[in-house]
């Protein structure tokens, strides 16, 4: 099957719109027509070399679509089903999977084709890789069946797509990773798509105070609409000092949702005793974070967060039910729609802070 895709060939260069060939689905694979795909900062990090990815590769990892065909061993979805996909592939058999932590699967390679198998995607004999095992900036995707979950057909696919990454990560960071408790105080550094999702997760969890921190007043105003009770423009002064004053001695939870090491340090220092800082953003590979060890005697802690500690097949329907109930606002998160050919404009708007989420749509 020949489809159009945005191919990443060189760092810091525009993606190349190319025709690529998708193989027939293998026994455990699913062919999905891409209807919508959110544009995430992780795609841009990969384009700039901050996340290591083989090349050439098709970026994009926040899609929703319609199943076109399935392999003979696939039972969870069938042709015509509406699905969302997530990068949290899992084998189902390793120690992490059987203990209920599929997002930390030790053998996600089991869901890929073998070295001796024909590639899923190619162009004139050249193997084209799939970023995050998805490669969703394309008119169709060939995926392992454990990468997709069936959703109800009445949910708009451009909204549902966000659940695959931004919402899964941000809401999950609050509900699953940190397990925010009712009545607590929360700080979120960064009011982009993931940060807004953390804010919504904290609101759903019943946080008493939710402070959004960003450099753009427009994004801070948006954060209030999604549940932030207070906002801080980080350019205005000493952010840590301001947070400690606003919270009466420090926050119970602080989330770094940008991917900047200095912000993780600020998240740690703004905590109250026994507070928890959570790294949600993708800090570039190799960067070092420096913390004053004396603060650990106050029983503060720092946690990593992998995709919101998700159990994708359970959490995706759960979060979409929050959407149905009006508790999770996906509609307002979709700021713009763009065709695949406008992917570079989507990256520009994201970098400029003009959007919460741009969603690519496919005819």
Give the location of each predicted region:
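Short Gly/Pro-enriched turn/cap motifs at secondary-structure boundaries
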Residues: 21-22, 54-60, 78, 128-133, ...
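C-terminal hydrophobic helical "lid"/dimerization subdomain
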Residues: 1, 249, 265-269, 273, ...
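Cysteine-cluster motifs in flexible loop/terminal segments that predominantly coordinate metals
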Residues: 87-146
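Glycine-rich cofactor phosphate-binding loops and adjacent beta1-alpha1 units
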Residues: 178-182, 194, 205, 215-217, ...
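Glycine-rich beta-strand-centered segment in the early N-terminal region that forms part
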Residues: 23-37, 47-98, 103, 152-154
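Mid-domain Rossmann-like dinucleotide-binding core that forms the NAD(H)/NADP(H) cofactor-binding site
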Residues: 139, 146-148, 152-237, 241-242
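Residues located in well-ordered beta-strands
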Residues: 4-6, 19-21, 33, 64-66, ...
């Amino acid at each position: 099957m020949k489809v159009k895709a945005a191919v990443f060939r060189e760092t810091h260069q525009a993606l190349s719109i190319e025709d690529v060939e998708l193989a027939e689905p293998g026994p455990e694979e699913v062919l999905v027509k891409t209807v919508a795909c959110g544009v995430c900062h992780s795609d841009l990090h990969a384009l700039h070399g901050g996340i290591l990815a083989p090349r050439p590769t098709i970026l994009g990892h926040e899609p929703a679509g319609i199943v076109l065909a399935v392999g003979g061993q696939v039972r969870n979805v069938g042709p015509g089903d509406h699905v969302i996909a997530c990068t949290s592939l899992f084998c189902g058999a390793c120690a992490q999977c059987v203990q209920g932590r599929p997002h930390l699967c030790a053998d996600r390679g089991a869901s890929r084709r073998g070295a001796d198998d024909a590639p899923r995607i190619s162009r004139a004999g050249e193997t084209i890789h799939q970023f995050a095992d998805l490669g969703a900036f394309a008119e169709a995707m060939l995926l392992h069946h454990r990468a997709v979950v069936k959703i109800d057909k009445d949910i708009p696919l451009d909204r549902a797509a966000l659940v695959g990454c931004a919402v899964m990560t941000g809401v999950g960071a609050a509900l699953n990773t940190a397990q925010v408790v009712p009545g607590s105080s929360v700080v979120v550094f960064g009011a982009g798509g993931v940060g807004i999702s953390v804010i919504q997760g904290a609101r759903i969890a019943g946080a008493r105070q939710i402070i959004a921190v960003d450099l753009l007043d427009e994004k801070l105003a948006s954060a209030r609409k999604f549940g932030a009770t207070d906002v801080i423009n980080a350019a205005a002064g000493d952010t840590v000092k301001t947070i400690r004053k606003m919270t009466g001695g420090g926050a119970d939870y602080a989330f770094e949702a940008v991917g900047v090491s200095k912000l993780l340090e600020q998240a740690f220092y703004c905590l109250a005793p026994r507070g928890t800082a959570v790294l949600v953003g993708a800090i570039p590979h190799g960067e070092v974070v420096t913390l004053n060890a004396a603060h650990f005697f106050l029983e503060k802690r720092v946690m990593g967060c992998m995709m919101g500690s998700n159990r994708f097949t359970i959490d995706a329907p759960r979060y979409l039910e929050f959407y149905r109930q009006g508790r999770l606002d996906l509609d307002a998160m979709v700021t713009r729609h763009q065709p695949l050919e406008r992917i570079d404009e989507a990256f520009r708007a994201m970098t400029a802070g003009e959007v919460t989420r741009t969603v690519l749509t496919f005819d």
